[in-house]
From Swiss-Prot:
The protein's name in its UniProt record: NADH-ubiquinone oxidoreductase chain 4L
Catalysed reactions, semicolon-separated: a ubiquinone + NADH + 5 H(+)(in) = a ubiquinol + NAD(+) + 4 H(+)(out)
Classification of source organism: Eukaryota, Metazoa, Spiralia, Lophotrochozoa, Annelida
TM ranges: 1-21, 27-47, 61-81
MF-aspect GO terms: NADH dehydrogenase (ubiquinone) activity
GO cellular component: mitochondrial membrane
Amino acid sequence: MYSSIMSLVFLLPIVAVVNLISNQSHFLMTLLSLEGITLSLVLFVPISLSIMSASNVSISVILLTFGACEASLGLSLMVLMSRSYGTDMLNSLTANKC
């Protein structure tokens, strides 16, 4: 039981990082990849604490709070960028607008 869950938890951040590397052009896909990494941390911490028989589960709540803050900041930046530049493409940020 634990081996299948742990393999899924170890596989999830790898898939999210590969998605982050392969989809660097769209801001929304970058945000989704970062949320996948945060989700894997939220899943990994309680599982590892239960394996080590630790009783402190407040760390996962703190990580979940930081994940929610990250999501709200990312979406507000995406709305600001799409209103300013008209697109969510990341290469529009680096283009020279002389």
